[in-house]
Structures are given as structure tokens and as C-alpha cells.
Amino acid sequence: MRIGAIDCGTNSIRLLIADAVVETDENGKETTRLKDVVRQMRIVRLGQGVDATGWLAQEALDRTFEAAREYAQLLKEHGADRVRFVATSATRDAGNRKVFMDGIQQILGIEPEVISGTEEASLSFAGAMRAVGAGDKNTLVFDLGGGSTEFVLGGGRGAEAKVISSRSVNVGCVRLTERHMVSAPVTDEQVQRVEADTDAAIETVVSSVPLSTATRAVAVAGTATTLAAAALGLETYDSEAINGTSLSLETVQRTAQMLRSMTRQERAELGYMHPGRVDVIGAGVTIYARILTRLNEITDGVINSVTVSEHDILDGIALSQL
């Protein structure tokens, strides 16, 4: 069976076409895994201005619909048997989301789903655990997106991953870049404002997710993978090198400061930096480093590193169709 999955977030829209492959272990137990056929991303900034206006901008809708048309063609060419389209933070917050949903349905011929933060967290967790291996009940996955960040505590692997508790908060690289007019280089005052918003968000997470019990941290999404590329000193973006890499708290903090201190032009010249992330990476890495710093404090030093996963909600969307 060939599965199609589309994740439409605040900053990007991504497509995964994968084959469901059944494998049998030495004990005769069958498991189903995904084998990638196509994996693509377009930066469309759907959430442009949503934090301030509460509406999806027409130019943002146009960019997203254009990418959706490309994906519709790829799904047709590769013969996907099932397709699921999931929209997250920006669409949840938008007063004109029906315009978006009607447009997507017309282009793709399927009904898009605007999922809750809770379901977003669950799908992110399932996708991340596919890549980092079976963990214990104290694995914390955080998915730092454009408009929101999901914190998920749980254990298990792939489709069997189980969420113990989760919380979605409205802190993301696009949202805070716009809210605090984050520049390049990022000023000390802007860092303080972004960190203050992040701290406030984490306080709301603690009320529903026992972060102090976490023994392992896993980070997913573009901010985390881009920082990993920088920390590894990659000349170009390399998914295989990034996936599963472990970074110390000190490395994350140091690399975040390096990226914050760069001008827009310096960031744009980095071989691993997607053009659509140049303007939002400063706020993104500030949020990322602050989350890991607070996790280190909350767990009394137990969490002092983070594992980076290339697999996230997009894989979770695909796994949900098995």
C-alpha cells in the first residue's frame, strides 16, 4: 500500500509518499514500516501575520495553494492509495480558515483536517519515535514549529508509541519573530523578550506535563535540524548526518548564539540554511536553547543533551493510516 501524507504548518508545507512494507522477525512477528518514495518541503509562510491579525493573508494562501498543486501532481504520478492532509497552528488560529480548507479540497480532492494541539502532539511523537528507537516512558519530544510548540511525554516506537501527557503552546519561530520584530543580528533585548515568552509557555506546560520526570529529550522540526547542521559544521544540509545526532546543552547554547549573531546575508550564505528560514532562525534557536536550558533546570541536570530527529509529525500522519 502506498500512503500520502501532507503536513501544513505555519512556516512550511511538506509531503511524504511512502510504501507500507511488512517485515517478519525471527519470532514470526509482523511489523509494518514506511519506506520513503518522495519527501519534499516548501516554505510558504502560511502563518504570515496570523498572530497579529487572526487571518490568513491572501499572498500566504496563494503560496500554499501553489505548493498544494505541485503535491497533487506528485501524488497522482506516484499513485498514492491513501492521502491525509493535516493543518496545524496557523490554520487553527485563523478566522478565515474555511477559505483555506475549501481551496485545498478543490486542489487535492480530499478534505483537509485542522487538528487540535493534542493530536498534533501525538502525531509528532509517533513520527519522532520511529527514528530514535524504542524509548522509556520518560522520553520527552518537543516539536518547535512556526506557530506553536508541542511537548509530549511518552514511550514506545512508531505506530505503537504511547503518549502519557502532552501540551501545545503558542510559541514558534514565525509567531515570535513577528511579535518581537526579531532582527538579524538578534539584539539582547529581543532575546530577553523571546525567552520570557518561552518561559511563560513552559510554565503552562508544567501544569499538565510532568517535565521533571523526563530522562531523555528529542527535538524535531526545522529549527532543531538546522541548528544541528550548524553544530555539525555541515557544508550542505544532510538529513542522514543530522538524524539521530546528539547535542549537549552547551553545544546548543553556543550554536544558537552563533546563528543569532549573524547578519541576514551571512545566514543566507550558509549551505545548509533553507532560504525560508533565514528570517526566523534567530527567534527559533532562541526558543530552542531556552527550552533545553529550562529542561536541564527542571530535571536537576538529568537532561543535559538532546537527540535530533528528522522524522516528526509528517511521519506520524503517514503512520496513522496504517
Feature-to-residue mapping (PLM):
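Short glycine-rich, Thr/Ser-proximal phosphate-binding strand/loop in the N-terminal lobe
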Residues: 11-59, 157-190
